[in-house]
From Swiss-Prot:
Annotated HAMAP family: PurH
MGS-like domain segment(s): 1-145
Molecular functions (GO terms): IMP cyclohydrolase activity; phosphoribosylaminoimidazolecarboxamide formyltransferase activity
Protein name: Bifunctional purine biosynthesis protein PurH
Family: Belongs to the PurH family.
InterPro entries per record: AICAR_Tfase_dup_dom_sf, Cytidine_deaminase-like, MGS-like_dom, MGS-like_dom_sf, PurH-like
Originating organism: Burkholderia orbicola (strain MC0-3)
Ranges in a coiled coil: none
Reaction(s) this enzyme catalyzes, per UniProt: (6R)-10-formyltetrahydrofolate + 5-amino-1-(5-phospho-beta-D-ribosyl)imidazole-4-carboxamide = 5-formamido-1-(5-phospho-D-ribosyl)imidazole-4-carboxamide + (6S)-5,6,7,8-tetrahydrofolate; IMP + H2O = 5-formamido-1-(5-phospho-D-ribosyl)imidazole-4-carboxamide
BP-aspect Gene Ontology terms: 'de novo' IMP biosynthetic process
Name of the encoding gene: purH
This protein's record includes keyword Transferase: yes
Annotated Gene Ontology cellular component terms: cytosol
Superkingdom of the organism of origin: Bacteria
Length: 521
């Protein structure tokens, strides 16, 4: 039974109402510093920890709760007579409920004007110590680190005579250990990122020790293949526009491959300002287009490769209305992603309950780093978020691209970034015409892209081509020109750039260099 609670929080969200409810249930309240003042000002009967222990706060508040009367009351096992006798001998009542959250270390170091001294002062000592004590003794002590759990604890107390059951206590304890591990990980990441000057402003992007924290969203039926087990985890600092924040409106449970492909589709479609549609198959775009609206964009994207679009993942950057829904519903689709779906669109898909509908807010979707596991290690890099500005482009051929060609080139370049290397993308009039992906030879990607267009009945005459990396020889360029391309955009940087540029001039096409490569593996 909970008779006495100790409350000490930095995040005071909901704490007054929670403490009042505890007091109404007859629970004695102990508290520290600002929390105690807040509760007292609200008219609640509260005892300062300093008065409770008979020992004042000291060292500018660094020592408040580090006292046997606090930790003895938390750690004592109620089922061990010798523990309870020791408490009685020293006049220590039990503390049955601990409500603590920690100094805002992560928020502090995120500030541009944060100093090392500021960071150090926001490393909580007493809070984690109490939390770990209570979590260790969770059989007898209820510990709350998250304001979202206040209602859960109160409901259980009211239903069970001020008692919280072991399953809840265990869940809350595991939450505490996860929280303190993440807190210590953030401190380690920060301190090991400091350079020799030990100044906040001189932090390295890549700390000497990297701690990562994720919460499990769900277990998955299997992984990339049926013989592999899998689960999906969410980054604790997930941006609003991230796939992990999806809201599923209908459909079967997402699979491992659904999630991986959906991320590729969503990240690609968000890069367009005009209404856009992206169709993904095996993490590669097989159709991308912009249009007057979602239905128009889908119709154009689907034309690129109707065969590959079968069973694909489709993403829109605008609301899916009834017209778009009716067009998509004619095909077999695994997942449909959009910022929103109209009521009429939802009605269209109500007859196709296996189709997974995901709503995600538009916005940034990834944190600062891209991670890839290798045997025994982890590759960490900044995101490939570089967007080439028109002022950075260099026309290196005798012929300048027309305004329309430049629009097509920039569209193709945007798509090529999301195609597995080696990538060759033919585009025209705001849509992909042929996509060559993932080949070991760039010239083979060029051939495949032109074959794809031919199979779809699309002409490449007057098309624009993007290559995610430079042409090592002129052969790849010769292939795309033979297919009908009149302009090419590529990074440049080959030892044979002069030869490739000369070939472009020989063909009478325009070539634009970006100076930026977009390998994708």
């Amino acid at each position: 039974m909970i008779k006495q609670a100790l409350i000490s929080v930095s995040d005071k969200t909901g704490i007054v109402d929670f403490a009042k409810s505890l007091s109404d249930l007859g629970v004695k309240l102990l508290s520290t510093g600002g929390t105690a003042k807040l509760l007292a000002d609200a008219g609640l009967p509260v005892t300062e920890v300093a008065d409770y222990t008979g020992f004042p706060e000291m060292l500018d508040g660094r020592v408040k709760t580090l006292h046997p009367k606090v930790h003895g009351g938390i750690l004592a096992r109620r089922d061990l007579p010798e523990h309870m006798q020791a408490l009685e001998q020293h006049g220590i009542p039990t503390i049955d409920l601990l409500v603590v959250n920690l100094y805002p270390f992560v928020a502090t170091i995120a500030k541009d004007d944060c100093t090392l001294a500021d960071a150090i002062e926001n490393i909580d000592i007493g809070g984690p110590t109490m939390l770990r004590s209570a979590a260790k003794n969770h059989r007898d002590v209820t510990v709350v680190v998250d304001p979202a759990d206040y209602a859960v604890v109160l409901d259980e107390m009211k239903a069970n005579g001020n008692t919280v059951g072991y399953p809840t206590n265990f869940r809350l304890a595991t939450k505490v250990f996860a929280h303190t591990a993440q807190y210590d990980g953030a401190i380690t990441n920060y301190l090991t990122s400091l350079t020799d000057e030990l100044q906040h402003a001189s932090r390295s992007t890549y700390p000497a020790t990297l701690n990562l924290a994720f919460d499990k969203v769900q277990d998955l039926r299997y992984g990339e293949n049926p013989h592999q087990s899998a689960a999906f985890y969410r980054d604790l600092a997930t941006p609003a526009g991230a796939l992990a924040n999806y809201r599923q409106l209908q459909g079967k449970e997402l699979s491992y491959n659904n999630i991986a492909d959906s991320d590729a589709a969503w990240e690609c479609v968000k890069t367009f300002d005009a209404p856009a549609c992206v169709i993904i198959k095996h993490a590669n775009p097989c159709g991308v287009a912009v249009g007057n609206d979602s239905a128009d964009a889908y119709a154009k994207a689907f034309q690129t490769d109707p065969t590959s679009a079968f069973g694909g993942i489709i993403a829109f950057n605008r609301e899916v209305d009834e017209a778009a829904a009716q067009a998509v519903a004619k095909q077999f689709v695994e997942v449909l992603i959009a910022p929103s779906f109209s009521d009429a669109a939802k009605q269209v898909f109500a007859a196709k309950q296996n189709v997974r509908l995901l709503e995600i807010a538009l916005g940034d979707g990834h944190n600062a780093f891209d991670l890839k596991r290798v045997g025994g290690g982890l590759l960490v890099q900044s995101l490939d978020s570089r967007n080439v500005q028109p002022s950075e482009l260099r026309v290196v051929t005798k012929r300048q691209p027309t305004a329309k060609e430049m629009d097509d080139l920039l569209f193709a370049w945007r798509v090529a970034k999301y195609v597995k290397s080696n990538a060759i993308v033919f585009c025209g009039n705001g849509m992909t015409l042929g996509v060559g992906a993932g080949q070991m030879s760039r010239v083979d990607s060029a051939r495949i892209a032109s074959i794809k267009a031919q199979n779809a009945g699309l002409t490449l005459a007057g098309s624009a081509v993007a290559s995610d990396a430079f042409f090592p020889f002129r052969d790849g360029l010769d292939v795309v020109v033979a297919a009908g391309a009149t302009c090419v955009i590529q990074p440049g940087g080959s030892m044979r750039d002069d030869e490739v540029i000369a070939a472009a001039d020989e063909h009478g096409i325009a070539m634009v260099l970006t100076g930026v490569r977009h390998f994708r593996h």
